[in-house]
Amino acid sequence: MKASMFLALAGLALLFVVCYASESEEKEFSNELLSSVLAVDDNSKGEERECLGFGKGCNPSNDQCCKSSNLVCSRKHRWCKYEIGK
């Protein structure tokens, strides 16, 4: 009876260690994945766009909206919108 209790407790302890180790690996993987995503995001911040995209805030006196996409800076709303009719 004592031997079976000892084996059961040893089995539970082993199961705990295995589960804890696999959970630690999962956390490390998710942390690495998150770090790589944030690193890619930081790299893209360094690259300034030459023009502003749709819905981006702008200044009508200094229109920096993308002309190639038919965007203009709205004087009323102060954001880049599509110019219709041209």
Swiss-Prot record:
Residues 1-21 form the signal peptide. Its main location: secreted. Transmembrane segments: none annotated. Pfam families: Toxin_12 (PF07740). Expressed by the venom gland. It is found in: Secreted. GO terms for molecular function: ion channel inhibitor activity; sodium channel regulator activity; toxin activity. Keywords: Amidation, Disulfide bond, Ion channel impairing toxin, Knottin, Neurotoxin, Presynaptic neurotoxin, Secreted, Signal, Toxin, Voltage-gated sodium channel impairing toxin. This is Mu-theraphotoxin-Hhn1b 1. It comes from Cyriopagopus hainanus.
